[in-house]
A protein has these predicted regions:
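Surface-exposed, charge/polar-rich loops and edge strands
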Residues: 1-373
Length: 373
């Protein structure tokens, strides 16, 4: 059960939404936040910069006074659609009760760095608000799909092109009760972004979330899919080199943990990585551009879609792949030791429309604030 909680959002006004919105804060360096705050005084970056200086609550009050932000009079949920560069996300924005993250209903595939979690707590305390959302992926059923389609046919609160080029459309959820009931039938969800916002939660805390249907994440984007030539070989390799484990842990060097989704339910396995030279360190593989070869060696020849990565990036790199066929379903791989934290996402082909592949789920949700008051 995904416990959906309507909330009183502090959100941009239609007149100022373009000036407020930009990409998620973790995608910006401190210098970029400072530069953006100076250039766009009504932006989310300006609020974050003020919070870093200990003046977050005052800045939030001034944004309301300037009518850049308003707080809704009644609790509700929202539909938020974002389009940029041919990619589209449309999901439900709502509070989710914190115990769903601690009782195994919502699973996280990695742990947050301590400094990221600490910075998030400080930002939340200084603003008295959650200033960005946790991004969740879930398997949408027919009822939820129908409700989503009906919601986005209503008149939006606003439709703007933001400063980063993303188009944002926001609807107030007129069917909040129906959506809450429908999500009570969703048995599991998975954290795609925002792990550092989930530290030290109290059971009844509301967590601001954007819930994306997984078919939105597995969107049609790239034709570079490589179909596996020998599916049986992949399964033989997996059976010989993997074992199921109760929970992810800290495996020895040369091993990795993976979250395996079987019929929508998560399970964990541990498998052996190939020996050198195919098992070269992740740092070597990344810097030399041989990461594709390493991952193909792990999964078997022709099992992997062309991996996309940007060497030298400090943030977590999401590497996507698509396995056509197979009973295991989605696999989230956590290499250890984490020289550079990598995540490999793969999914069984029959779960996706023909011609589909994965793209990097950099979901921009800089429109959102959840005021605790």
């Amino acid at each position: 059960v995904i416990p959906i909680l309507p909330f009183r959002a502090t959100r941009p006004t239609a007149a100022k939404a373009r000036e407020f919105s930009l990409e998620r804060m973790e995608h910006l360096s401190a210098d970029q936040i400072l530069e953006t705050a100076g250039r766009l005084p009504l932006s989310l970056a300006a609020l974050v910069q003020a919070a870093m200086a200990g003046e977050g609550a005052a800045k939030l009050a001034s944004l309301r006074a300037d009518k850049a932000l308003l707080q809704e009079p009644e609790p509700t949920v929202y539909m938020h659609r974002q389009v940029k560069g041919g990619r589209k996300h449309c999901g439900l924005v709502a509070g989710v009760r914190a115990d769903a993250f601690t009782n195994g209903v919502i699973r996280a595939h990695r742990h947050a760095r301590g400094e990221d979690a600490a910075q998030w707590r400080l930002l939340t305390e200084r603003c008295a608000a959650q200033v960005d959302s946790v991004i969740l992926g879930f398997e949408a059923n027919e009822v939820i799909t129908d409700l989503f389609e009906r919601e986005v046919n209503d008149r939006p609160l606003f439709h703007v092109v933001a400063g980063d080029g993303a188009t944002h459309t926001l609807w107030s959820g007129r069917r909040a009760a129906d959506l809450t009931t429908a999500f009570a039938e969703v048995r599991s969800a998975y954290v795609l972004e925002g792990h550092h916002r989930l530290q030290n939660l109290q059971p009844n805390d509301p967590v601001l979330c954007m819930l994306l249907p997984l078919n939105e994440v597995f969107a049609r984007w790239s034709p570079r899919l490589v179909r596996p030539s020998a599916d049986a070989a992949w399964h033989a390799w997996l059976q010989s080199n993997a074992e199921m484990v109760a929970e992810p842990g800290m495996p020895a060097a040369g091993f990795a943990d993976a979250c395996v989704l079987r019929d929508g339910a998560p399970a964990w396995m541990r498998f052996r990585l190939p020996p050198p030279p195919l098992g070269a360190t992740l740092a070597d593989a990344t810097e030399s551009g041989r990461l594709d070869a390493l991952l193909r060696a792990v999964l078997g020849a022709d099992s992997l879609a062309a991996a996309s990565h940007q060497p030298g990036e400090d943030r977590v790199m999401q590497l996507q792949a698509l396995l056509a066929g197979g009973a295991w379903g989605s696999v989230i791989v956590l290499p250890h030791p984490p020289v550079r934290e990598l995540t490999l996402l793969a999914d069984a082909g029959e779960r996706l429309p023909a011609g589909s592949t994965w793209f990097e789920p950099r979901v921009r949700s800089g429109l959102w604030l959840h005021h605790h008051g």
